[in-house]
Swiss-Prot record:
GO biological process, one term: tRNA thio-modification
Main location class: cytoplasm
An example molecular function term from Gene Ontology annotations: tRNA binding
Lineage: Eukaryota, Metazoa, Ecdysozoa, Arthropoda, Hexapoda
Pathway note: tRNA modification; 5-methoxycarbonylmethyl-2-thiouridine-tRNA biosynthesis
Protein name, as recorded: Cytoplasmic tRNA 2-thiolation protein 1
Length: 343
């Protein structure tokens, strides 16, 4: 038997919100979903009037909903923002080439300028070629590091004031779990921050969907009939995040509020003053923000170009030994060639 919408609008409920358990009609769900994101933007002071904001666009559900809602709220509440789409082409055949077509559709639907940057033009490599070198055990490390820096490079080219990413509540809860399991206190400190970066040397990133459940994002996209790309990356099944995601889904079955509980716990964490803190600086090679010298992207790229794809995987000391060994082998080879030429 149909039940009434809890918002008492007079309509029958069409869905049950995963976040609150409320039975709502579609229109009231849209209103509640959009109002929560507006509250997140305003209460966290994510933007200022007149700013130029790049919406990180992959063509997936999160970035598509983010672009749609940002445009909607910008017009409804007169934020006064100049919105553009920024997309990164990692060079994954059968995945990114198809999803970029969706991004182009978003560009046309939302009337936003679009900038696409590729790994090939930035680094001289595609993910297809990287996976052929490294295999499928550490490929997500390369992709994640290169994509983060590629977004910074794109933002700098576009001259934007901030980058809005589609990270949702599920993503952030997963990241908290991953950092706890890895003992990564440096990332655990900042992974729940709604704004990261900023300052004179970097462009800040913001997460308007920080408190939005993934299930509600999917429902919103479905009922709004938004065009998005839903195929999983062909290289993702072996990613470490997948284990955290499966664990989180199991917890959610027992306790539906676990996603928000984990985020709130992460926000309240405090660390001893003796805990090691990474020092942000500028990479001496590429000129982008880094907490190490050279930055992780430059180390990974050096490894690929040297024929040592595992150079940036693991501890820095291990990478230094690999470089020293290769330099020694090259020196011996060069010396052997000199002796050969003498005869």
């Amino acid at each position: 038997m149909p039940i009434d919408c809890k918002a008492k609008c007079g309509n029958k409920a069409a869905l049950k919100r995963p976040k609150t358990g409320d039975a709502l009609c579609k229109d009231c769900f849209f209103a509640a979903f959009e109002a929560e994101i507006h509250h997140t933007i305003v209460s966290s002071r994510l933007f200022r009037r007149g700013e130029k904001v790049a919406v990180a666009a992959s063509g997936g559900k999160d970035s598509t909903v983010l672009a749609h809602v940002m445009k909607l709220l910008n017009e409804r509440h007169d934020y006064g923002l100049d919105l553009v789409l920024l997309s990164i082409d990692e060079g994954i055949t059968g995945y990114r080439d198809d999803s970029l077509e969706t991004v182009k559709q978003n560009r046309d639907d939302y009337q936003m300028p679009l900038k696409i940057l590729s790994y090939e033009e930035l680094y001289g490599w595609t993910m297809d070629r990287i996976v052929a070198q490294i295999g499928r055990s550490n490929n997500c490390t390369f992709c994640g590091v290169f994509r983060r820096q590629a977004l910074d490079r794109g933002a700098k080219l576009l001259g934007v004031d901030s980058i809005a990413t589609g990270h949702n509540a599920d993503d952030i809860a997963e990241t908290v779990l991953m950092n706890i399991l890895r003992g990564d206190t440096a990332r655990l400190r900042r992974c729940t921050n709604i704004r990261t970066g900023g300052g004179e040397d970097s462009i800040p990133r913001v997460k308007p969907l920080k408190y939005s459940y993934e299930k509600e994002i999917v429902m919103y996209a479905h009922y709004k009939r938004l065009v998005y790309f839903s195929t999983e990356c062909v290289f993702a099944p072996n990613a470490y995040r997948g284990h955290a995601r499966a664990f989180l889904k199991d917890l959610e079955k027992v306790r539906p509020s676990v996603i928000m509980d984990i985020i709130y716990s992460g926000e309240q964490l405090r660390f001893k003053d003796t805990a090691k803190k990474p020092v942000r600086g500028i990479c001496e090679r590429c000129g982008f923000v880094s907490s190490q010298q050279p930055c992780k992207a430059c180390v990974l790229l050096e490894g690929l170009n040297r024929g040592l794809p595992k150079l940036g995987i693991g501890k820095k000391s291990k990478g230094d030994r690999m470089i020293a060994q290769q330099n020694q082998e090259l020196a011996l080879r060069e010396r052997a060639n000199l002796v050969k030429n003498d005869f």
